[in-house]
Amino acid sequence: MLSKKCKYAIHALVHMAKTPSEKFLIKEISDACLIPKKFLEGILLDLKRAGILGSKQGKGGGYTLRKSPAEVNLADVVRLFDGAIAAVPCATHKFYERCEECVDEATCTVRAAFLQVRNATVEMLKSDTIESLLATENRLKSEKGNKNPESSKKQKKTARF
């Protein structure tokens, strides 16, 4: 499961990707993404240390994207904030640990299964970039805006449980 910190980082990056050459104040991102300001400060510093963001202090300053939205993939963001992507320590690539109860990794069915899960997850996260998330957001907003208000009223009436 993604941490709140990781989800907030992704939301902040998508917001910044809307105007990638702009300088953003913490308050602006906090207000737009509904992220607590103090929490966001630490997130942006982590992104800066990772080389994803740059910053300038003082008048006319703020945070900027150092990498293009197409260069920032979800695998990098998830690893930065949440560490290993795999569900079991023996299936991680960058944070490998042998499981205490494992008799033989080479024949372990749990490890074999979760290596496949990890590989598929990593590939998906690597292929999803901040740019692709912004495109998805734009598409979803467009689809939401194109819905007929009358049909959504009918759906609300029939959706009661």
Give a label for each model feature.
Residues 11-19, 80:
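Short amphipathic alpha-helical elements of helix-turn-helix/winged-helix folds
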Residues 17-21, 67-68:
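Short helix-capping/hinge SLiMs at alpha-helix to coil transitions
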Residues 51-66:
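Beta-hairpin "wing" of winged helix-turn-helix
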